[in-house]
């Protein structure tokens, strides 16, 4: 039965391009050739091209077969599971091996012979399609095995959680009412505790130390200086605030900046604006000072023209300060007036 589709050759015969000639026509060509008919006459009689007749007769004379296909059958399959297994083993042992080296090893190990050994292109295709993904998966598994176990996640800003003066002070001092509490991990940035840092070598104070001094809260480093505060000095007498101590402090304030011991005259009030003071009484140089020792401040040797050793600023000594010399002078004056009368 002839196919329903095809092309017509130059002899008027019908053929299908790319398809072999039917077996019946092949057998008829061989029978006519055995009868002694020339190939050209067979071609005209059967309407088959001269090339097709010559090719079929030549194959029949060589192999004795009229069937189409490769002579001696197709090449057997060479990419067997055993060959693929050996190729995978070679690749795992030496990841940088070439395809032609794998081919030589297959021949050297006796896995294949020269008739069924795969070609270099076939080995490359096997490495790319079948072993490539497995090799990548093996590398990934080995990486996961050698990778250390993940550590538990730490909260933010606790990577370098080292003790610092700020956190220690915050732990000791309670938060005052009305002020929101600040977590210790967010209050101040962490500093790397190293004894070989530049600030430690040069003796420069770190930022946390400066902030701890300026902060209103009490820090451990400030506790060392608390013993030297003014609160531990004995309190001065109340009368000394308005008396001699006040004048001595004013003298220290006015004359403390004077160069070479000279007074700063421009900082004084003019003499015309000051009221005249009464003449001080004569006081014996031997008297007892009853003020608190903490209120005494040494003044400069320079004194005002109208002042006395007891009042450098020409001020009266308050009556609350009792001096034995003044009492003796007053008693002597009263006795003189009484005798005169």
Curated annotation (Swiss-Prot):
Its main location: nucleus. The keyword Transcription regulation applies. GO terms for molecular function: DNA-binding transcription factor activity, RNA polymerase II-specific; RNA polymerase II cis-regulatory region sequence-specific DNA binding. Residues 168-189 are annotated as: Interaction with KDM5B. Residues 4-130 bind DNA. It is found in: Nucleus. Transmembrane segments: none annotated. Keywords: Developmental protein, DNA-binding, Nucleus, Paired box, Transcription, Transcription regulation. InterPro entries: Homeodomain-like_sf, PAIRED_DNA-bd_dom, Paired_dom, PAX_fam, WH-like_DNA-bd_sf. Residues 7-63 are annotated as: PAI subdomain. It comes from the Eukaryota. One of its GO terms (cellular component) is nucleus. Residues 82-130 are annotated as: RED subdomain. Transcription factor required for normal development of thymus, parathyroid glands, ultimobranchial bodies, teeth, skeletal elements of skull and larynx as well as distal limbs. Interacts with KDM5B. This is Paired box protein Pax-9. The gene is PAX9.
């Amino acid at each position: 039965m002839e196919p329903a589709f095809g092309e017509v050759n130059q002899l008027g015969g019908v053929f299908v391009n790319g398809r072999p000639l039917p077996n019946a026509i092949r057998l008829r060509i061989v029978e006519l050739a055995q009868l002694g008919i020339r190939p050209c006459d067979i071609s005209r009689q059967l309407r088959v091209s001269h090339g097709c007749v010559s090719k079929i007769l030549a194959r029949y004379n060589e192999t004795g077969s009229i069937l189409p296909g490769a002579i001696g059958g197709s090449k057997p399959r060479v990419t067997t599971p055993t060959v693929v297994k050996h190729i995978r083993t070679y690749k795992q042992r030496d990841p940088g091996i070439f395809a032609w080296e794998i081919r030589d090893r297959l021949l050297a190990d006796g896995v294949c012979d020269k008739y069924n050994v795969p070609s270099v292109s076939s080995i490359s295709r096997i490495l790319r399609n079948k072993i490539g993904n497995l090799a990548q998966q093996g590398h990934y598994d080995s990486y996961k095995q050698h990778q250390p176990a993940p550590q538990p996640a730490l909260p933010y800003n606790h990577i370098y959680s080292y003790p610092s003066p700020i956190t220690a002070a915050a732990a000791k001092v309670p938060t005052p009412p009305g002020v929101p509490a600040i977590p210790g991990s967010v209050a101040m940035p962490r500093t790397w505790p190293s004894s070989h840092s530049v600030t430690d070598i040069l003796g420069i104070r770190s930022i946390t130390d400066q902030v701890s001094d300026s902060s209103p809260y009490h820090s451990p480093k400030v506790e060392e200086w608390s013993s030297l505060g003014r609160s531990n000095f004995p309190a001065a007498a109340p009368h000394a605030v308005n008396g001699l101590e006040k004048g001595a402090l004013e003298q220290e304030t006015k004359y403390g900046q004077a160069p070479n011991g000279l007074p700063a005259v421009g900082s004084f009030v003019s003499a015309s604006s000051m009221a005249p003071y009464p003449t001080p009484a004569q006081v014996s140089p031997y008297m007892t000072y009853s003020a608190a020792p903490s209120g005494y401040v040494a003044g400069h040797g320079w004194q005002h023209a109208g002042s006395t050793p007891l009042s450098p600023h020409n001020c009266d000594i308050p009556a609350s300060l009792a001096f034995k010399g003044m009492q003796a002078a007053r008693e002597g004056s009263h006795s003189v007036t009484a005798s005169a009368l």
